[in-house]
Design a protein with these regions (language model features):
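Secretory/organelle targeting and membrane-embedding segments
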Residues: 1-168, 172-508
Length: 508
């Protein structure tokens, strides 16, 4: 543990080239798991790398009856347990001087008056300059009451060149109607340009690298079209169950929790056209074009699949099925696995199926985008020389082991012509000596500096729900989801969905 106060970041460090202005961040739900494990460590790591202005302040808002010292101890413990850059007393002392805590419930007007007084005191004493962001790390059901009190106390109002912003966590509603209702609540007190919707997957280095790989390398972009691409598979798999999240997860499920935001955003980045300029407006516009061009399959019964994990053995241990988890009703129809087939009706992607799947208690923890290329039209040494899966593929590994894998055919050493699949791998951890910023570091800094390319616009949110709502409505009429064994890759119906098309799921 070092006591030396760190200097500003290395000027050659271009991973996060901007520094926040003088500002404050207010976190509602400061005692939740997200704040404790992700937000507080990310804020500290930004400060530890010299990327937060010395005037930065952090205010927590929660029901706990804490003294300032209690709050400091909580923040420090969270940082020490989860920091990525190592604990430094100098950084901590600088950050600690800007810590404040306001005790109160979300519906307590007096608590918001105390919060307004705290914000004014920080502007006066700390020099935050009237710039404040409000992070709603709380369930969406509390958004209306928090928004109302922020408005009633004038905390959403700015003067001159000051700014006030709001950062909200998913889910952005549970269907199109509720998403619009939430947007209406927020838009009454904040302009759209001041609303930052967090999808932490968009802050991951590999996701941002999709655009760099496509548009900075002439070898990939010419092949990135229906002429050469057979299909695209986007997978987000977890090898764990719901744990203690029954209250959140039941009634939401894999499709709402993962496909509606993470996977449709990954699909949009994969399928979008090159923006004229690398600006938030133009990147968002290209993603919106993709989402608006999505077409559902005609028969949802055979081209979608949903499931629930059953009890069984996984990783050498006996695990409970979803319906046996604490807090889950015995008749729950919530999906813990979801798979869908979509089409993007543009000239580039006409006829190319996009297969999206997400689930819990699957074979391994992995998130990847696999662009599967068409087989060679003619092979001079005969198809018998090829392996059964002889298709080139470019796989973008989002997590873990971030990187790229190119699958291609190569001759097996020997006297006969036999071609087998081999891979060429690029791994971030091997190619770059420095660590990539954690996703929340990038997103929090972007929100503080007002850069929005990695934050979905409300139009993207609504377009995503327009895609998913018909599927969810159909599933509601289908009774209980199909069960699948833990440690497998989902229900049989998901495999049948691709088998009918003469394809199979890639094994990550």
């Amino acid at each position: 543990m070092s006591n030396e106060i760190p200097t500003l970041r290395d000027p050659q460090d271009r991973r996060l080239p901007r520094i926040s202005p003088p500002c404050g961040l207010v976190i509602f739900g400061i005692t939740g798991d997200l704040a404790r494990k992700k937000l507080l460590p990310a804020i500290y790591d930004l400060a530890n790398r010299g990327l937060l202005h010395p005037a930065f302040s952090l205010t927590g808002f929660a029901r706990r009856d804490w003294s300032p010292q209690d709050f400091e101890e909580y923040v420090r413990a969270s940082i020490e347990a989860h920091t990525r850059t190592g604990f430094n007393e100098g950084t901590w002392n600088q950050l600690r001087s800007g810590l404040r805590f306001v005790s109160g419930t979300f519906d307590d007007p007096e608590a918001y008056r105390r919060l307004a007084d705290t914000v004014a005191e920080l502007d006066r004493v700390r020099g935050t300059g009237g710039n404040h962001a409000f992070y709603l790390s709380i369930p969406p059901s509390y958004f209306p009451v928090v928004a109302k009190h922020l408005s009633d106390t004038g905390l959403n109002k700015r003067q001159g060149r000051e700014w006030r912003r709001v950062i909200i966590e998913k889910p952005f509603g549970h269907n199109l109607e509720s998403a619009r209702e939430l947007s209406d609540v927020i838009s009454q007190i904040f302009d759209e340009q001041d609303v930052f919707r967090i999808d932490h997957y968009l802050g991951k280095e590999t996701v941002q690298n999709i655009m760099a790989m496509r548009f900075a390398n002439a070898m990939f972009e010419p092949l990135w079209k229906a002429n050469y691409v057979d299909s695209v598979q986007i997978t987000m798999a977890e090898d764990i169950g719901i744990g203690t999240r029954a209250g959140y997860y039941d009634g939401i499920g894999a499709a709402r929790d993962i496909i509606q935001n993470h996977l449709l955003q990954l699909m949009a980045l994969t399928a979008m056209e090159e923006p004229v300029h690398f600006t938030p407006e133009e990147i968002r516009a290209e993603k919106e074009k993709v989402l608006s061009a999505v077409r559902l399959p005609e028969d949802l019964a055979i081209d979608t699949a949903r499931g629930q994990y059953a009890s069984g053995w996984q990783g050498g241990a006996q695990v409970r099925g979803y319906l046996e988890e604490d807090g889950i009703p015995a008749d729950s129809t919530t999906d813990t696995f979801a798979a869908i087939k979509l089409f993007v009706d543009t000239r580039r992607w006409a006829g190319v199926p996009f297969y999206l799947r997400a689930g819990k208690r699957l074979g391994k923890r992995v998130t990847e985008i696999a662009v599967i290329f068409k087989r060679s039209a003619h092979v001079p040494f005969g198809n018998s020389a090829l392996s059964e899966s002889a298709q080139n593929a470019l796989v973008i590994r989002v997590q873990p082991d971030e990187g790229l894998t190119l699958k291609l055919g190569a001759k097996v050493p020997g006297t006969s012509m036999q071609v087998r699949d081999v891979t060429m791998d690029f791994a971030y951890g091997h190619a770059f000596t420095e660590d990539s910023p954690e996703a929340y570091e990038r997103l929090i800094l972007d929100a503080l500096v007002g850069s929005a390319p990695l934050f979905p616009h409300q139009r993207e949110v609504e377009a995503s729900w327009k895609i998913l709502d018909p599927i969810l409505s159909f599933w509601e009429t289908q009774g209980q989801p199909e069960s699948y064994a833990p440690g497998t890759w989902g229900p049989q119906s998901a495999h049948d969905m691709l088998a009918r098309d003469g394809r199979f799921w890639r094994l990550p």
